[in-house]
Amino acid sequence: MLEPQENGVIDLPDYEHVEDETFPPFPPPASPERQDGEGTEPDEESGNGAPVRVPPKRTVKRNIPKLDAQRLISERGLPALRHVFDKAKFKGKGHEAEDLKMLIRHMEHWAHRLFPKLQFEDFIDRVEYLGSKKEVQTCLKRIRLDLPILHEDFVSNNDEVAENNEHDVTSTELDPFLTNLSESEMFASELSRSLTEEQQQRIERNKQLALERRQAKLLSNSQTLGNDMLMNTPRAHTVEEVNTDEDQKEESNGLNEDILDNPCNDAIANTLNEEETLLDQSFKNVQQQLDATSRNITEAR
């Protein structure tokens, strides 16, 4: 303690003439001479103050999903749009606004499942732009033609083909008559192909002769019927019917003889019989018309 002097003034030491102590400067931070622990952090394993290199952080680059042509034709894209409206029931006429809301709601759901990052308006603009791409156009063509697009479609088609083949095999095994029918049809087609040109010309000539005979006899019968109607003799009808029956028998006998001469009897007989029935039907129609005209004439008299 400093003792107070007179007049209450404390006698202070004279610091002006006292020399200060000289301290050495601090060493640099990385110097091993520092002992205050403010240098480099000591290594835990080695215990030395050597610097430790920190490895750089590895940044993983993640691909940002984009709405491109490949994503649009993927499983959730245009192929999924075929089955979006399977369970939708539209009300029809008078409920157009409700049906439109339902349609837009289903489309929004499909767009959100495909690419939830975009709003529906931006999604529609993007799809409209992608519609000109070649991949999208080919996908749309395959959808319109009902062709397989996804792997599931190919698998289902192969399964159906295999089932159909198994069904065909079992049906042929169970029904042996089908094979006999196919063999008979093949034999008939071979017969028709094996006809020579001479035989075909003969068949055509017989057809033409039969048609000419029928037409000539129809004309002669119509003329005689007109004359008989003028004479008003009921006996004429019976005579004409007898003549026509005899003529038909003669023609049928002639055709049968021609058919017997032909080696391919079965194939030709069917065609000639069909033509003969058609000619008989046309003759009957003409006969009915003539009978009707004769009745009208007699009633008028």
UniProtKB/Swiss-Prot annotation:
Region (Interaction with TIMELESS): 67-143
Disordered, as annotated region: 1-61, 240-261
Any Gene Ontology biological process: mitotic intra-S DNA damage checkpoint signaling
Keywords: Cell cycle, Cell division, Cytoplasm, DNA damage, Mitosis, Nucleus, Phosphoprotein
One Gene Ontology CC term in the entry: replication fork protection complex
Sequence positions bearing Phosphothreonine: T233, T244
Molecular function GO terms recorded: DNA binding
Location(s) in or outside the cell: Cytoplasm; Nucleus
PANTHER family per the UniProt record, alphabetical: CALMODULIN-REGULATED SPECTRIN-ASSOCIATED PROTEIN 3-RELATED (PTHR13220:SF12), TIMELESS INTERACTING-RELATED (PTHR13220)
Purpose of the protein: Plays an important role in the control of DNA replication and the maintenance of replication fork stability. Important for cell survival after DNA damage or replication stress. May be specifically required for the ATR-CHEK1 pathway in the replication checkpoint induced by hydroxyurea or ultraviolet light. Forms a complex with TIMELESS and this complex regulates DNA replication processes under both normal and stress conditions, stabilizes replication forks and influences both CHEK1 phosphorylation and the intra-S phase checkpoint in response to genotoxic stress.
Quaternary structure annotation from Swiss-Prot or TrEMBL: Interacts with TIMELESS (via N-terminus), which impairs TIMELESS self-association. Associates with the MCM2-7 complex. Interacts with RPA2, PRDX2.
Family: Belongs to the CSM3 family.
Protein name in UniProt: TIMELESS-interacting protein
Organism of origin: Homo sapiens (Human)
Annotated gene: TIPIN
